[in-house]
């Protein structure tokens, strides 16, 4: 087959590692760089520009005090950056080790609804939620022959977060803040891969364990004299399964696909003082018992499929379709969408047989989340309507064998 492994890597590794999926997922946590032949290194950077908005609730009441603009404005940081890197070393013909870096989980929501009223600007509602993670996976692989690769290894992960709530819509939680100090914890991964190099065929199945973080959390209560309380809270990032497959269909064309499952249903963020305040006031409003800061109703399933065409020894192009199921959560500022459909394209330049440069662009159209269901737990900052939200991801990646 004339289609080279570098042509495959250029686009697969560019799109596979950048994501704007369900929950807080920001990476597909692919194992693909580790499956490259020989010694290999890569570095990638991508940026997301999102336009995500909706309309607030209680519009009739707001109109009575002269408010006519019910739009939330853009709910997310317009310039979300993705960084990935990998080094894979073939220590012996039958033994390899990899170091894979990504930022798999995170969110950057900064929303403030402060419309003009008959008495001037009024703080109705504001939400600031920011989570950030760093992940280093260290798979060690055993290759008994040219086809099989069995691998496992530790996953080192840090996670931190902050939440701020404000505005009259929050009543007793107006002014609440929570700071989850950065925590380091460990998980593990394992999997296997089968390949037939002569026809560029490769398939892999990998599993990542959940990672349990125990945070030192600092919460500030919105009372006459602000009180800061410290405590502990636990957050478990989700376990996941990835399946990837690719094969050449001619001397110049290769098709590929991937499927990913993530267990978001067991993920939640509920600091202790936040819960205690809700419990205390639930005597007056029983619905407060079910309020969750961050929680997801369903697990996530996502898929990608694409075609790579090799034009000559220097240039290849790719086209890709993507789909994400979402987590079926109610419409809110924290969940303005429920999955997406996407389409992308990429261009790969082969500097020589060992080095490639790749650039790509991916357009995402988000599906609208539904308004709150009676079976859901109450959510923070519910919305009455979602806009036609979308995002664009563009990125660059370089890789080389050595």
What residue spans do the PLM features occupy?
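N-terminal, post-signal peptide beta-strand-biased segments of exported outer-membrane/organellar beta-barrel
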Residues: 2-11, 15-103, 108-111
